[in-house]
Amino acid sequence: MSKKIKVGIVGATGYTGVELLRLLAAHPDVEVAAVTSRSEAGTAVADYFPSLRGVYGLAFQTPDEAGLEQCDIVFFATPNGIAMKDAPRLIEQGVRVIDLSADFRIRDIPTWEHWYGMTHAAPDLVSQAVYGLSELNREAVAQARLVANPGCYPTCVSLPLVPLLRQCRLKPGMPLIADCKSGVSGAGRKGNVGSLLCEVGDNFKAYGIAGHRHLPEIRQTIAGLQDGIAEGFVFTPHLAPMIRGMHATVYLHLSDGICPETILRDYYRDSLFVDILPAGSTPETRSVRGANLCRISIQQAAQSDVWVVLSVIDNLVKGAAGQAVQNMNIMFGLKETHGLGAIPLLP
């Protein structure tokens, strides 16, 4: 590509923001032209993130000063409630937008307002947003002006289910249970007692049992693919004593006489970022650390009609910034692997 794509990042001081900067630094077709932060305006990116010394010469600017309207695409790596106020103006000016927050993920406005506790500022734009689960909506993402990047739990849970749901292979009326674990970085970079080392180290706990914001997002995907399944979906997230990584164990009931591994392999045969492991394998979170990968295995529980799906991602990469870059590549007709060739870190 002769002319590089001009990229802006709004809210670049959080974990997803620095992941975007890390990934885009290795992208051959983009130029990061603007990075914003109200609290760190004037601070050099390399001073704020020592890992980026010698990589970026930019300084953070306020959104009003950054010239975002001159970018080809803008990523919003902001808390919920920001993109829905600021993205409409950019879209009107011809800028394409990928929102990493939850502002445009839920199509039913009352449902979104219930779970996120605020009035939606751009309800008319929600119907125009494409849900950016890349392997499900690739064609729609390619044409999108606004992509709602999925949440980390929804990505980890949905990717192994999509091929089975598309063929209506789950048994209606039976429970579908997702037991998930996340690294602490999923809580973001803000100060929080629950994220302190003394709280999470040598500890393991469930949270959000009465209702997690990602529940309606996952149910929306399920309901859009197969009837009679979403109502029986149960989701329990856990906080694991690790920095990054996500593991989902999904228990499901399938139609008789099928080979689910074959269905998964056939669906993801040409997908570069989904790895279907051999039967009996148990994917590990460290096998995807730092990479835009989802590794999946499926096997039947012993002496049971229950199937067990295991799925792992890096919550900051395939669960956030990596999938956002993948969606950008699709939107601009680039190779999906550009900027996403990192091999997982081990140990």
Curated annotation (Swiss-Prot):
An individual GO BP term: L-arginine biosynthetic process
Catalyzed reactions: N-acetyl-L-glutamate 5-semialdehyde + phosphate + NADP(+) = N-acetyl-L-glutamyl 5-phosphate + NADPH + H(+)
Pfam families given in the database record: Semialdhyde_dh, Semialdhyde_dhC_1
Keyword annotations: Amino-acid biosynthesis, Arginine biosynthesis, Cytoplasm, NADP, Oxidoreductase
Subcellular location, record wording: Cytoplasm
Major localisation: cytoplasm
Active-site positions on this chain: C152
EC nos: 1.2.1.38
GO cellular component entries: cytoplasm
This protein's pathway: Amino-acid biosynthesis; L-arginine biosynthesis; N(2)-acetyl-L-ornithine from L-glutamate: step 3/4
GO molecular-function terms, A-Z: N-acetyl-gamma-glutamyl-phosphate reductase activity; NAD binding; NADP+ binding
InterPro entries assigned: AGPR_AS (IPR023013), AGPR_type-1 (IPR000706), NAD(P)-bd_dom_sf (IPR036291), NAGSA_dehydrogenase (IPR050085), Semialdehyde_DH_NAD-bd (IPR000534)
Protein family according to the UniProt entry: Belongs to the NAGSA dehydrogenase family. Type 1 subfamily.
Protein name: N-acetyl-gamma-glutamyl-phosphate reductase
Native organism taxonomy: Bacteria, Pseudomonadati, Pseudomonadota, Betaproteobacteria, Neisseriales
Gene for this chain: argC
